[in-house]
Amino acid sequence: MIRPTRHTSLITSLIAIGAALVATLALANPASARPLGQTPRAATSAPVAATPPMGWNDWYTFFCDVNEQLVEQTADAMVSSGMRDAGYRYVNLDDCWAASTRDANGHLRADPTKFPHGMKAVADYVHARGLKLGIYEDVGTKTCAGYPGSYGHVQDDADTFASWGVDFVKVDWCNVPFGDFPGLSQQQVAVKLYTAYSQALKATGRPMFFSICEWDPKLRPWTWAPAISNMWRTNNDYGSQWSQTLANLDQEAPLAQYAGPGHWNDPDILMVGKMANDAESRAHFSAWAMLAAPLLAGNDLRNMSAATKATLTNREVIAVDQDPRGAQATRLSHTDAADVWIRTLANGDRAVMLLNRGDTTTRISTTAQAAGLPSAGAYAVRDLWAHRTAESAGVIAASVPAHSAALYRVSPLKDGAGDYPPATEVDVDPQVPPAYPGSDLHVAKAGQTITTVAGFGDDGRTAVTDATLNLTGPSGWKIDGRPVSAPAVPTGKRLSGTWQVTVPADVGPGSYTLTGTATYRWGDGAHAATARTESTVRVLVGPTGSPYLSDLSWLSATNGYGPVLVDKSYFGGPLTIHGTTYQHGLWTNAVASIEYYLGGRCSRLTADLGLDDSVQGQGSVTYRISADGRSIYDSGVVTNGTPTAHVDVPLTGAQVVRIDVGDAGDGVTYDNADIAQPRLTCADS
């Protein structure tokens, strides 16, 4: 869940006192912090999560707006959607389920308004549908949202959860009283508190999946949590932006050695159905499956699109995630534009993900040999999204659209060949110029003519024949050029052609699809086949008049903590700087960046910059504004003591404006930075 304590004074006595792990630590809370009877009882055997858990978590869609009806309706939806039959089991509550105080005996209790029948009844409802109930707590004095924490009540809370029939316990890392642990580093405190919680859960005698949500990667939970838990967070909370998905994926790249049956790296809840489009959701789901990550859906299961349901219930992809070997994927190659990830499966197959990180269609390739497969005359390449198998001589390649992934299951063919069609690839490369020199953004304009190159390649063991390649586009787009043909395309060779594509003069903003289609024959001409791929051309139109940035769609946005928020602060109220509230603006937490397309139409930007008043005098950031990659404003270090910066910068002729928020060199805690009333002055048409 998102932790307000990262930005407010909810964490009391937070002391940065080192990060070295002491190998031998006491396994219970200090007596001074533990009421009588709170020593964890002798532990029984630990529950084992042989494969990563699958289920649902409410936080990223509902936050604190949770209740009994939501949980029960979600359980019903998990059944009716086919998710239960696909392997999803856990229905997990996050923060805000509890009453604001414990009962007279010091026990946790569910909020009587949100859960009028109590948590035991909710658990019974979930169990009756063949599902399991998960719940949330915190090792600190309060949860991240300010509800009663487990500090000093660990065994009692574990017993309470067991008595309710809880099956999964997620324990967060907020409001930790570090002052009660003199001489210990934060990492040592984490090990101490979470070990005590692990013992308490085991001592109940009820198998409960233990999820550690110690969200500070500086404490390296992957080095100590495997011994005491079933999964552990490897990063901070994130949002549904593509860049944040990539950041969490990158965090996992060096951590494969720490995961395995019974203990899993947790890159956070799934954002499937919340991403910018279905392709991003499929790529995200592919990546989490490759990571052997917990598959905890974070969308509203009661109201999801057919595409979202199809993504979440793709059994071939789920089988990769749930592979019994439990070996997390490793990254074979990495650039800013593309990744290749490899995962070894229990039967010796390799799962291969070709991930396009960038904003344009890219050909990505590897080989069966590079994936670690034994030498063979041919390989079966199973596309886990298209549900089709092809035969390859060894190349594993695809033309992957922007923000997308191709996911394959690859195995050697025992007899060197099979009855599969040859693996082929079609690529389309519209050569759209950058928005400005050196930019990664490629934008087409109305009336512009774009040279587009398309190709068709044969990666199979034998040649294909009677090949023809053509390019088509949207209605109203002019395409000059004829289909290209060849009597045969041998293995490892390509057929290519060039077309001139003209964007209509009256086109509106959006992403437009160019399709390359190849027809051919295989199997000594006995079988006809078609292969195609799509590439998008992005058309943007700059703003007009005097809009606020917060009323426009950004090109990209990254944030150090959760998503960039529009016209509100983290806590839902207005942006506020030094007592002045603002109706319009952007809330960020360092390190953050936001880009907007201007198209050369705007002449100036005005804004008020400063730390949000919610951080109560803490935090420090820097602001930097650039136009087409050229710096036009630098704030220097900004603290709560710095007067509000009233910015007025020129933008004449700029295609793109970018605002960066830095951490001023002292970390990102409390770095809630507002970009208030950010207003453009642009041409009227």
Model-derived features: positions:
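Glycan-recognition surfaces
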Residues: 153-156, 202, 206-300, 321
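Gly-Asp-aromatic-enriched flexible segments
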Residues: 538-685
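Short beta-strand elements of extracellular/lumenal beta-sandwich folds
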Residues: 348-354, 446-462
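C-terminal beta-strand-rich structural cap/linker in extracellular carbohydrate-active enzymes
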Residues: 392-422
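Aromatic-lined carbohydrate-binding/catalytic grooves of carbohydrate-active enzymes
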Residues: 74, 78-184
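Carbohydrate-binding surface patches
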Residues: 288-291, 296-298, 334-373
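Short, surface-exposed loop/turn segments at beta-strand-coil junctions that are enriched for proline
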Residues: 502-508
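Secretory targeting and sorting signals
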Residues: 1-35
